[in-house]
Amino acid sequence: MVQLYVSDSVSRISFADGRVIVWSEELGESQYPIETLDGITLFGRPTMTTPFIVEMLKRERDIQLFTTDGHYQGRISTPDVSYAPRLRQQVHRTDDPAFCLSLSKRIVSRKILNQQALIRAHTSGQDVAESIRTMKHSLAWVDRSGSLAELNGFEGNAAKAYFTALGHLVPQEFAFQGRSTRPPLDAFNSMVSLGYSLLYKNIIGAIERHSLNAYIGFLHQDSRGHATLASDLMEVWRAPIIDDTVLRLIADGVVDTRAFSKNSDTGAVFATREATRSIARAFGNRIARTATYIKGDPHRYTFQYALDLQLQSLVRVIEAGHPSRLVDIDITSEPSGA
């Protein structure tokens, strides 16, 4: 099962004979068996036929809608029919500080390890030793954290060191000097922000398919409109799925700084239509590729399949109350771009 990403060059999407039919003046017609699709993400304003929408809803496949320049608009999905006992257990676990802290430690530890693996995979002579040392120091203190506040402090220190290291890897013309959001202030931040948005929406859909509530998390604090559980789960995926993809787009010359524009009033930097297409296409290709994602499991999976394994393990963790049983998303044994 894969998530299909459709660029704004597409003008019509229809359904016939068990296949989703995508047509554009640029590429002509493409067909995809609907049973192979986990969902569809659309950019721009293509015409969608009623049979296509009905079939997607009947099969509980989400349709996510983004503007041409990558801003999320909403989604078309079936009503949430979550399993009530599971939701009660989820809420019950969030009221247990020890459970939340233990689960959050596993997430943060793996996030830092995956960030270190990404830096090492992309380093070719750059001086990132100090950043790696800082990340290792923070990692050593994660398990000693006595509260979520302490844990967030160590995670923040590691994140600062990680983005400092990324600053040595990103070409100078991209003017990347650290993470900036709302708005992104340089081309690199603009690309990863778009990627994180695509990843976040993808994970929300996966959470709901497993009858959990995406807005009830364990690591991130509640805030209106924030799917905190999606943010929790995506922490371990940011580096291998998004950051790696963006670094490779730059290294391969697929995008350059000419593909971005800056708002003179706000300083915000946004990708052009063509750059947004390239990023969305690269993200779609990345999550369709197989890799060894699960610690202790030599099998290669697509991102979507590995995400389902992660969520299945989270359901078991919630039901049994044992955070140590959460599947460990480990990219340290295989560079994420492999």
Swiss-Prot record:
E.C. number(s) listed in UniProt: 3.1.-.-
Q: State the GO CC annotations.
A: peptidoglycan-based cell wall
Q: Which residues bind Mn(2+)?
A: 155, 220, 235
CDD domains (UniProt xref): Cas1_I-II-III
Required co-factor(s) are: Mg(2+); Mn(2+)
| Knockout-associated phenotype | Deletion of the entire CRISPR-Cas locus (cas6 to cas2, Rv2824c to Rv2816c) decreases resistance to plasmids encoding spacer elements about 6-fold.
Gene Ontology molecular function terms on file: DNA binding; endonuclease activity; metal ion binding
InterPro entries attached to this UniProt entry: Cas1, CRISPR-assoc_Cas1, CRISPR-assoc_Cas1_C, CRISPR-assoc_Cas1_N
Keywords assigned by UniProt, alphabetized? Antiviral defense, DNA-binding, Endonuclease, Hydrolase, Magnesium, Manganese, Metal-binding, Nuclease
Please verify whether the record's keywords include Manganese.
yes
The further comment given in this record reads: Encoded in a type III-A CRISPR locus.
Q: How does it assemble?
A: Homodimer, forms a heterotetramer with a Cas2 homodimer.
Q: Which family does it belong to?
A: Belongs to the CRISPR-associated endonuclease Cas1 family.
Tell me which PANTHER family the record gives.
CRISPR-ASSOCIATED ENDONUCLEASE CAS1 1
The protein's name: CRISPR-associated endonuclease Cas1
Species in which this protein is naturally found: Mycobacterium tuberculosis (strain ATCC 25618 / H37Rv)
- Whichever gene encodes this chain, its name is cas1
